[in-house]
């Protein structure tokens, strides 16, 4: 017997919707804070107890809700942010579906007090999505929402939550991204009474970066910006010497919304190409503005993923912007000093940079107050000492800008010796330099081969003894399809019997006496990839050839050899890292050396 089709109750529908919208406490925080942002808030307090499982309180000074709309706000698909289908394709707000409040209320105890500031406020309480009480409230402009006993009626959901530190980490990550996306809003976040994040809302993105990642990282960041007919990009990129083991420090923000987009992450990594070691990732915050018509945010329940109609163009703009920003800088990292010396130096730097006229004992630390400040709905909060630290933070000043028109990105260095036949020691008026000789020549060779491969020269060297290569049938078929692409990197395959190719010539710039080895490795590189990209094949080939043709460690060099290597390195377009992202050169300034030997105190 066929089962009858019935319409689900609103309570059950809301629970189903909550399964997509409210996955964990961080989802509640995200939705409620985004509502506060859409309401025009300038100050938002987030108070969390037990990673949100006990209580989540959001207080804002936004526009508030009219008394007659309070109950309506908890109906599914009730929203003030869009009115018709056309609005759906030009979304300017973070929320627009009208699902968050009813979904959250359906799986928790929720209390809300709100007012527009013009009349008395309204207070409403719900349990499991049902209104328990609605009455008059305070007239303070803004909204306060308290969510407790989350998932009380869906115990299965509780079983899938992680540990408290993990759930707290998820909340912190969400708020960090929101703060980066909205530097003009003051976010004050505390957990069990302990402040975890505090931004002053003055619109300075660099100060938000300092509040989240630390002052030392903010001081290593440089402004980046680019613009085209469709996109406007601004933000901060941290120098390659400061990097991380995962992509979590990459923040891409589109029209005020933090999003995850693999293509944009790849574009950012391309901008840092050869500047980062393998397996390391940059710290970067990009704010991207575009017409809402070319971005679809209605493709993911949590709106974390978007669909871009001009994704490739945006990616190219980002990559080029990052490359140009770093190409202007002198990216020589400073040598590490002893931990004790570092602590002394750090203390002195803070004293000089931020509080020059005050004794060291008065220097405050970020978020040193034991509890979060009492909520003040005013737009103008009283200045705090930690705000002063951020406001007076000096910008990063690259040495390269002192000689803006100079084509040489590293100074003239004079070799004074070699250590373990691996590292070159050199000096000039700026201090001591240590150069990895293999990495230095690898960078030089890489740029040479990259240029040669890109030219696709037809000047060929005939082989006295042609090379015959045999392959399994599947590899033979793949190579047959990709012969044209292989020719663009200097591999000219001719069919030679069953499952075999013959190579009769190679470009004249191939490394002498290593021609066959190079040809085989290029072919192996092409076969190892699921699909052959000519750009990647050229890049990988240049890296491979530069590594094999460069001097190795334990190779003694004469003074003339070292001078020639350093002079050639100065002519490289990116002389600071090898193609794999390892540093080529490290500097110890004269001042640092004098501090080590206590010549200055």
From Swiss-Prot:
**GO terms for MF:** ATP binding; ATP hydrolysis activity; ATP-dependent DNA damage sensor activity; mismatched DNA binding
Is Transmembrane helix one of the keywords?
A: no
The record's annotation in InterPro entries points to: DNA_mismatch_repair_CS, DNA_mismatch_repair_MutL, DNA_mismatch_S5_2-like, HATPase_C_sf, MutL/Mlh/PMS, MutL/Mlh/Pms-like, MutL_C, MutL_C_dimsub
CDD domains given in the database record: HATPase_MutL-MLH-PMS-like, MutL_Trans
- Would you say which domain of life the source belongs to? Bacteria
Q: What keywords are assigned to this protein?
A: DNA damage, DNA repair
Question: Looking at the UniProt record for this protein, which Gene Ontology cellular component terms does it annotate, in alphabetical order?
Answer: mismatch repair complex
Which Gene Ontology terms describe the biological processes this protein takes part in?
Answer: mismatch repair
Family, similarity comment? Belongs to the DNA mismatch repair MutL/HexB family.
Q: What does this protein do?
A: This protein is involved in the repair of mismatches in DNA. It is required for dam-dependent methyl-directed DNA mismatch repair. May act as a 'molecular matchmaker', a protein that promotes the formation of a stable complex between two or more DNA-binding proteins in an ATP-dependent manner without itself being part of a final effector complex.
- Record-given protein name: DNA mismatch repair protein MutL
Organism classification? Bacteria, Bacillati, Bacillota, Bacilli, Bacillales
């Amino acid at each position: 017997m066929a089962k009858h089709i019935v319409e689900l109750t609103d309570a059950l529908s809301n629970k189903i919707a909550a399964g997509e919208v409210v996955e964990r406490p961080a989802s509640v925080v995200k939705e409620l804070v985004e509502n506060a942002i859409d309401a025009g808030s300038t100050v938002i307090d987030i108070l969390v107890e037990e990673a949100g499982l006990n209580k989540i309180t959001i207080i804002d000074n936004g526009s508030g809700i009219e008394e007659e709309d309070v109950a309506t706000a908890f109906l599914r698909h009730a929203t003030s942010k869009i009115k018709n289908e056309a609005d759906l394709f030009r979304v300017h707000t973070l929320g627009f579906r009208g699902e968050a409040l009813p979904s959250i209320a359906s799986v928790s105890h929720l209390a809300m007090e709100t007012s527009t500031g013009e009349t008395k406020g309204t207070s409403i309480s719900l349990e499991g999505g049902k209104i328990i009480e609605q009455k008059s409230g305070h007239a303070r402009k803004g909204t306060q929402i308290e969510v407790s006993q989350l998932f009380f009626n869906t115990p299965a959901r509780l079983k899938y939550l992680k540990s408290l530190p993990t759930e707290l980490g998820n909340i912190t990550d969400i708020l960090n991204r929101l703060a980066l996306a909205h530097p003009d809003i003051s976010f004050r976040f505390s957990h069990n009474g302990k402040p975890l994040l505090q931004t002053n809302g003055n619109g300075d993105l660099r100060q938000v970066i300092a509040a989240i990642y630390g002052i030392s990282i903010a001081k290593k960041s440089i402004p980046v910006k680019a613009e085209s007919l469709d996109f406007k990009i601004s933000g901060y990129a941290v120098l390659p010497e400061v990097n991380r083991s995962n992509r979590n420090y990459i923040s891409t923000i589109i029209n005020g919304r933090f999003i995850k987009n693999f293509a944009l992450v790849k574009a950012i990594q391309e901008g840092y190409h050869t500047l980062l070691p393998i397996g390391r990732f940059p710290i970067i915050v990009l704010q991207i503005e575009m017409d809402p018509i070319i971005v679809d945010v209605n493709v993911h329940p949590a709106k974390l993923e978007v669909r871009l109609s001009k994704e490739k163009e945006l990616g190219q703009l980002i990559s080029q912007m990052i490359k140009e920003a770093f190409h202007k800088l002198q990216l020589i990292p400073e040598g590490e000093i002893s931990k004790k010396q570092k602590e002394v130096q750090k203390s002195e730097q803070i004293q000089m940079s931020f509080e020059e006229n005050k004794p060291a004992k008065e220097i405050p630390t970020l978020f040193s107050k034991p509890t979060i400040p009492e909520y003040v709905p005013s737009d103008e909060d009283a200045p705090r000492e930690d705000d002063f630290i951020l406001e007076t933070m000096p910008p990063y000043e690259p040495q390269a800008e002192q000689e803006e028109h100079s084509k040489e990105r590293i100074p003239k260095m004079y070799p004074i010796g070699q250590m373990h036949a691996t590292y070159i020691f050199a000096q000039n008026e700026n201090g001591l330099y240590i150069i990895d000789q293999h990495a230095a020549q690898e960078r030089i060779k890489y740029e040479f081969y990259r240029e040669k491969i890109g030219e696709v020269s037809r000047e060929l060297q005939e082989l006295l003894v042609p090379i015959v290569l045999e392959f399994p049938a599947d590899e033979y078929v793949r190579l047959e399809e990709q012969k044209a692409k292989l020719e663009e990197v200097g591999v000219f395959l001719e069919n030679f019997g069953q499952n075999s190719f013959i190579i009769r010539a190679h470009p004249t710039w191939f490394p002498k006496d290593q021609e066959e080895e190079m040809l085989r490795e290029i072919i192996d590189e092409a076969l190892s990839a699921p699909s052959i990209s000519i750009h990647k094949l050229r890049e990988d080939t240049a890296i491979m050839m530069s590594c094999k043709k460069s001097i190795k460690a334990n190779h003694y060099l004469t003074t003339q050899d070292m001078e020639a290597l350093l002079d050639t390195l100065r002519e490289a377009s990116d002389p600071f890292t090898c193609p794999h992202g390892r540093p080529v050169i490290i500097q110890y300034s004269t001042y640092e050396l004098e501090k080590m030997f206590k010549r200055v105190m």
